[in-house]
């Protein structure tokens, strides 16, 4: 039997060095890694001799080993429980809220929250009432106390460095201790939460309200996504160059809302994308998300994509009222080397488009380089991020490999940077993942992304049922 700390040749988890995680953030060095100029490799600009590709170095899976063999049944040491009732106490405000006990050896939650990533120059102050300040759940506690589930009792609020600062986003309002009308509406729809708890979870970065100010002015009914809330279901739809149109997409929206879809993504790649998107937003009562790069390349070559096109497209869609953008900024030039070892390669359309752009231009991901500018634009409208996982596995054989987890570490850094700009964040996740790797993936994201909501595209535990992803 393999014990929980044994490494074997068949170890399914990736070899990523622990220094990829810091010093200043869990994502740190991997998100800022550089590569050489050896053009001999088919991935132009990658130096195959760079130490970052040394498979014998200590790895991320050494720091966060997955348990094997002696995985333990939580019911054996939790008095009064029976199989199927292993839940931890549902305390609002801790990193393990509404969870089951961790399998021994899993990555621990992050001791940091969005409170640790305030804008430069901001401070915090104590308040005397929950009506005017948040429970800063990891404020005033040691990391050990916080991770053990102890809750703070001090009410705090953020103090901007500009005395005339006016909050624009739900995150900024929450940091200032403000309960917005949208938070009150969310609490009505989540009866186990109070408006103050909704605010506190948003301030911690564990909850988002995807609600573009332009869409709120129409008929959007605010909802929330995050661990403290009920599980939400997204419905994908979209017109293609050969099928569907505006009327059909609006009809799909009606069906999605009727049968309980909490959010809808318009993934149209053909037809009149602009008119279709406008019609959907005009009729939708649920948040609408898009993948803006799909529109950016309509009518032009991918290699012509530049900063002006990106910003113009994002602003136009934000003006229309799109509530969240999926942006694949976590796919970095240095990650492409690891895709060569995959059985299937890159299956994300947005990820593959940006990978090709990087290879053509022999430079870093343009979305990564523009991150702060993109954040500032999204803040104006309170558009939320759904940070895309462009290197998600397209089959079980590629699950939890170097490429996937290097990108996840980068996404952790992008989450921190977005929080510093006052923008709400959720994180996209895989994808095709074997059943025994799901918990490891979930817990590692919780660590690297500090509890930001995880918007998983599945996970799909089999590759042999194409066309039925809603079942698998």
What is the role of each PLM region?
Residues 467:
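Histidine/acidic-rich helix-loop-helix segments that form or flank divalent-metal centers
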Residues 153-154, 168:
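A ubiquitous short alpha-helical element
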Residues 2-146, 161, 169, 173, ...:
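Alpha/beta enzyme core
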